Each structure stands twice: as structure tokens, then as C-alpha cells.
Amino acid sequence: MDTILLFMLPAGLWAQDAGVAATTAAPDATAGALGELATGLNTVWMLLAAMLVFFMQPGFALVEAGFIRTKNTANVLMKNLVDFMFGSILFWFIGFGLMFGIGGFVGAPHFFNLEAMDKIIDNGLPIEGFLIFQTVFCATAATIVSGAMAERTKFSMYLVYTVFISVLIYPVSGHWTWGGGWLMNGDEGSFMMRTFGTTFHDFAGSTVVHSVGGWIAWVGAAILGPRIGKYGKDGKSRAIPGHSLTLACLGVFILWFGWFGFNPGSQLAAATSGDQTAISHVFLTTNLAACAGGFFALVASWMKYGKPSLSLTLNGVLAGLVGITAGCDLVSPFGSVLIGAICGVVMIFAVDFIDHVLKIDDPVGASSVHGACGCLGTILTGLFATEEGLFYGGGSSFLLAQLFGAAVVGVWAAGMGFIVFKVLDKIHGLRVPKRIEEEGLDIYEHGESAYN
């Protein structure tokens, strides 16, 4: 009997070891499955957000088409189409590596080498999905310029501009911020930490996307000069109405819808309850800012001009959306209403100042909506952020960091835009001949009209 027990003992011990191994393996397998599920949810959310941001492209096209005359509609639609097509290829080929590669001032480029970029970024998301998400943001910055330079720009020169913003201007300043560069480097001893004790914050792109496009639009419109007939001999501005506020209104609603991918999608995760709470908060602050921007622009235009202007109210909605994009994750719902309201009112006066004082002809108000309000919204985040904001007892450090970051990116974008457009103007001329401008760009540039 003792002999039998002696032989059974190792078998019993082996069975216990197998049980322990099975018990250990089960949690590991469960954890792995949950990890894969979380990655899947995050990926689907990111790609869904990318689709929403892509849908902003027809929104921009309709807004710009509505704010210009019929004879130039096909031209502006073509520019919105082409900057996405060109920009997508160029950003994949060069811009993505410059923006997210390793480096302080600019990332080391890995030309169309997504395998190398995947090892560098390592954010748990498929690299191809992350690329397409970032591509639609780059395309947004590029297309902002189209409206400001509408009705008088050579199509060929616009294509050249698209190359520069997609492979250089946007990726470099994007690297400083979202690419782990010096403006958002929180390491001890980094420039921002030594200077301000905190880093620059731009959650979804008030500065990184919108003010970059807005400042380039402002510089481009200034170099290009006003449309024929915009200013009289006495220097007074003359209104040149767009041909369809219906299209413009539809475009704004599409942009508003797309912004629910632009801002909440920048969370880049949706698997945990914390992610879902953050996404919901950003949805709310984004919508409230849009509503406040539109409402206060309506009131301001009513008080200033005697009647509530639809075109200015539409731009007020966009101003609120642009303004809240930097701090939509940090501010309270009340703070988002204040940011939207301030941006909506400031947009009215920025349009007036640029048009009547600076004498810069911006047919759609892009430099006011995206440039001025993108910069302003970034700065207001330093006031209304509930943890570090000045109005919440956070001191001035965060506000100063926001001011500095917005200024640096603005100078970069405006400076590079000035160089690009000046060189193009000297080499080949930015502007179409006077006769073509008077007859319209649709037939001259494309051989077809938007309306028959």
C-alpha cells in the first residue's frame, strides 16, 4: 500500500501543478483578450473620428462656394478637392515622418516607411489608422487658405502652395506640439519646463491646425491683393456678396457635424469609462461653444449693423468651434460658453478690422475665423482651464505658456507663408490676369462652369 501511495504522489503533485498553471493561464488569456478588445475599440473610434473629419472637406467646399460668386465656384470646389488629394499623398510620403519622427525641432523623416514610424510612435494603435487620422487634420489646415485667396489666384500656384503646407509648414509646427517636440516636452530641464514650469496645450488644434491655416490665409490674401472692385477710389470697402447663403449654411452644419470627430476624436481612445467620460465632456464643450459663438455673433452683428447677419452668424458658429478646440478637454461647460461667446464677438471685429483698416480682402473671413480665433481660443484656455487656468487659481504660468506657443506657431506659419507666396509671386505670379478675373476663373482655369 505504501508503495502504491509512493507512486501516486508525483502524479498528484503534477495534477496540482497543472491546475495552478491552468489557473494562472486563464487570467493571462482574459487580460490579453481584454487588451485586444480595448485596442479594437480605440481603433474603431479613431477611424470613425477620421471619417467625420474627412466629411469636413465638403463642408469647407460648400462654405467657400456659397461666399463667392458663381463664376468662380468650380475653381474653389476644385481647390478643395485637390488639396486633399495632393495633401494625403505628400503627408504620407514626407510630412508624417517630419511631424512624428524623433527630434526636437523637427522629426527625422522616414519616407513612406510606416514600419519604422510604428516603432517610433508606439501608441498602441495601428500605424496606418493613425496616419489617416493625422492626414485629415493636415488637409483641414491646407484647405482653410483656399477661401481667403478665392476668385483671383492661379490654380497652378495653389497646387504649389499645397505641397509646402503638407510637407513642411504644418508638419514642422505640428512636431513641436503633437509630435513630442519642444513646445510640449514636459521633461525636467526642457525649455518649456525651465521657462514656464508647464507645457503648451492644444488638445485638437486651435493653433496646430486652425491658426496655422488662418495665418497663411491672411498672408496670402495680403500678398495677392484685393479683388477688382473691392475697394473704391476713396479706399472704402465695397461688399461683394456671395452667390448662395444656402450653400454656406449647409456647409457650416456639415463642419459642425464633422467637428464632433475633430475634437472628441482627439481623445484617441474609447475603451475605458474614463475615455468615455472625456469624450462626452468634449462633445458637450464643443457644441456649447459653437452655439455661443453663433448666438453672440448674431447679437453683435445686430447691434453693429442694425440687422442680424446670417453670414456673420455662420462664421460665429465656426469661430466658437475653432476657439474651443484647444481647451475642449480642460474647460468646464460654462467656460466653453464664455470662450465661444468671446470668439464670436471678436470674429465680428476682426473681420471689420482686416477689411476696413488693413485693406486685406478675405472673401470668406478665414483669417478672422481660423487665424484670430484659433490664437484667441488657445490663449483663453490659459484663463478657463479648470486646473491650471488663471481664473481657477492656477497662476499665470499656464497662460504665459499658451501665449508663447500660439505666438511661436503663428510667427512660423505667417513667416513661411510669406516666403512661399512671395517667391511664387516673383517667379510665376500668384494672380490671374485682370480680364480672366473679371470673366471668372471657372472657364479660364477649368474649361467648365459650376452652373449651366
Question: Where is each model-derived feature located?
Answer:
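N-terminal secretory/membrane targeting signals
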Residues: 1-18
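Glycine- and aromatic-enriched membrane alpha-helices
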Residues: 14-452
